[in-house]
Regions:
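Glycine-rich beta-alpha junction loops
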Residues: 8-10, 152-154, 206-208
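Short coil/turn connectors at secondary-structure junctions
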Residues: 1, 49-50, 82-84, 105-108, ...
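Cysteine-nucleophile active-site neighborhood
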Residues: 60-136
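Redox-cofactor binding/interface segments in oxidoreductases and associated redox assembly factors
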Residues: 54-55, 88, 202
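A glycine-centered loop/beta-turn motif at secondary-structure junctions
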Residues: 186-224
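Conserved beta-strand scaffold positions in the cores of enzyme catalytic domains, especially
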Residues: 6, 37, 112, 147-149, ...
Length: 235
């Protein structure tokens, strides 16, 4: 049985990112494996023994609530430290970092990603695409990554985190916008997402795993403890 943790869908479920858990479940079932989704709502403890965890996007207040809960509970941190895969989208990426800006203040993050997020004046909205860096646990990715971004965050990665992709379209992490008060939409944009240990995070909505089946299968393989090449192809 593959047990998929859908983390805080009541506060980090604004943009349909719950669909990532559905994609994982369906792609497992299509290969003949039993799989179930376990929603974990605000105020509930995060079980640390599930096979994989997904987090979605949300607005400022929701982010703060999510960060406070995940920090105080500690279950997701223990799961990630044990090597269980975690996949986070947009606000989820920011919440898992060291800090992020929300509601006019700097908020402590969970600390699973060496990343800090500042605010931008102009919202990044539109298609985003990148070539995988193949960093860390994403070494087997070969296909371009695509999604839809909608965020005001500019994220800088520290030395312990690596980008998921190198941008070919869109804003992605808008990493250079985090270093200055920039309103220019043409500010340098270099990277998309983050990879650190068992955590993969991205600004791609879509849902991301529906648009990027190879990434979905990579996460599925990690959750099942097998190599990506060992998963049977889906016709």
């Amino acid at each position: 049985m593959l047990n998929i943790g859908l983390v805080l869908p009541d506060v980090l479920g604004t943009y349909g990112d719950d669909g990532n858990a559905l994609v994982l479940r369906q792609r497992a079932r299509m290969r003949g494996f039993e799989a179930e989704i376990h929603p974990i709502r605000l105020g509930e403890p995060v079980p640390e023994t599930l096979d994989i965890y997904t987090l979605g996007g949300g607005e400022d207040t929701a982010q703060i609530l999510a960060a406070d809960h995940l920090i105080s509970d500690g279950g997701l941190t223990r799961a990630a430290n044990a090597g269980r895969p975690v996949f986070a989208i947009c606000a989820g990426l920011q919440v898992l970092g060291e800090s992020f800006r929300a509601s006019g203040r700097i908020v402590d993050g969970v600390g699973l990603l060496d990343a800090t997020t500042a605010g931008m004046q102009d919202r990044a909205i539109g298609e985003v695409a990148s070539e995988p860096t193949r960093a860390g646990v994403t070494a087997d990715l070969t296909e371009p990554l695509t999604g839809f971004e909608n965020h005001l965050g500019a994220t800088i990665l520290g030395p312990s985190a690596q980008p998921l992709g190198t941008l070919t379209r869109g804003n992605g992490n808008a990493d250079q916008a985090a270093t200055a008060d920039l309103s220019d939409g043409s500010a340098q944009r270099t990277y998309e997402g983050a990879v650190q240990d068992s955590v993969i995070a991205t600004y791609m909505h879509g849902p991301a795993l529906a648009r990027n089946p190879q990434l979905a299968d990579l996460l599925l393989a990690q959750a099942m403890g097998v190599a990506l090449a060992d998963l049977e192809p889906i016709e």
